[in-house]
Amino acid sequence: MTITKFILLFIVTSISGIGAATEEYQTHRPLIASTLVGLALGDIKSGVMAGASMELVALGWMTIGASVPPDPALAGTIAAILTIIGKQNIGISISIAIPVAVAGQILQIVQKSTIDVIIMHWADKFAEKGNTAGITAMHFLTGIPSALRVAVPSLMVAYFANVSYVQIMLNKIPKPITSGLQVASGFLVVVGYAMIMQLLNIKELLPFFFIGFLATTFSNITLVGLAVLGGSLAAIYYFYFIKDDNRNTGRSRRVKTADLNSDAVNVENELNEKNESIKLNRKDLMKVFWRMQFYQLSWNYERMQNLCYCYSLIPVLKKLYKTKEDLSKALKRHMEYFNTHQFTVPVVLGVNAAMEEARANNEKIDNEMITGIKVALMGPLAGLGDPIFWGILRPMTAAIGAGIALGGNIAGPIIFFIIINIIRLIMRYYGLIISYNQGVNMITSIKDIMPKIMKTVTVLAYTVMGGLVAKWTVINVPVRLYSYRSNGKLITVTVQQQLDAIMPNMLPLCFTFFIYYLLRKKVPPVLCIIGLMILGIIGYSFGILK
């Protein structure tokens, strides 16, 4: 490996490491991370193919609350490096990348519970002094260990994979293991599908999963066509089963609003009578918007998104509070514990910006009201953001991109990158602007509309997931049942042929629901993956699987 490739590999793996911390641009997803590695090493096609296969395995790997999955960034970079430099087939590369990703999960937990906590406490000292530049610097300082956490292991694997005796050792792995792992790579994807189904968990909508499955099994529908089918079914479900419920929304809204605490209602009244002496404008809100592009970089295990949130709100606080003392109080107020889904956090930021504006104009809003609104919103928004964005939109777009990329088509990762970032930017912008304009009224609006949106999008997700089970899960049982002669030719009938005669793709469907059952019984996804890898090796060794 040349010095140029070494430097490029360091840069792209660092980008993926920072992406794993922020989860903004999705550069940490295997489909993107492997493509970047392929670009750095001069073999884009192999990188795209490795990333597509790894992405389908890792579809269900998502960060929810304090729960950290195996590191998808490391999985993607290692899979591509072993495929390109180590000259291994993709199945072997994925099988090695998965345990490395589990080790990366441990590294991330250590980083976020030690290094990033220390840096966050340094930010506390800057908040005490009213030093916004210091807080900003601490937020971005956490990006260094995040970058190195992925870059260093990736470079080590690249170095050793390039050494001749390591390649000889990899090539001497017994064929039953290498071929068995290759066989297992065909059905490891069911773990990701099952994880997403567990997150969605709306049983009355499961029939749409079977619609997608059957449509793909008995037709030549493409992934784009599958998405259109899912979107059409979602539209039908909304207009015929959900939209009519909106008639009752107006009747119940007052009742729902009454359920909010009295402080929130009082805040709303205060916000409607804003003093024009200090007024936030679109330029101020756009500063918050641009800061959100690296929102979750400084997430830590002690106070989670506190530094992220404070860093994002700094432009608003600097404009509203002119003295160091007032600014320091505001900064410390937003350095308290906070955590929600990063794509829905603009809603909280917008409401808080409106409240801080009212407070700066001497209206009757205290620290407890501002903090109380944050606490009241963060749970429901996380509960909606995780399934909608991580459980539906990201895996759906990633699966479509991966499906296009399996043959080495770079359009796959590009399409995924563009679509997911358009969704992200729309949510960031309008979530912030609308919530600022509505103030505390936003709470009622969210409670009314988000559950309906979730059910509608879940119809789309189930349809696509069902189709993916049929399209990308490969299980072949070549065991011979019997033979007979027809027109002088010997015809052999296998178990797979008999199963296909009953219903094609029966085994992929059964495997998916079996893993879904195990996950609901609290079996860790990593153990499911390891179990399927062992099944692939044993099945191939005894001639049961091919």
What are these regions (language model features)?
Residues 94-189, 319, 325-466:
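Helix-loop-helix junctions within the multi-pass membrane cores of secondary transporters/permeases
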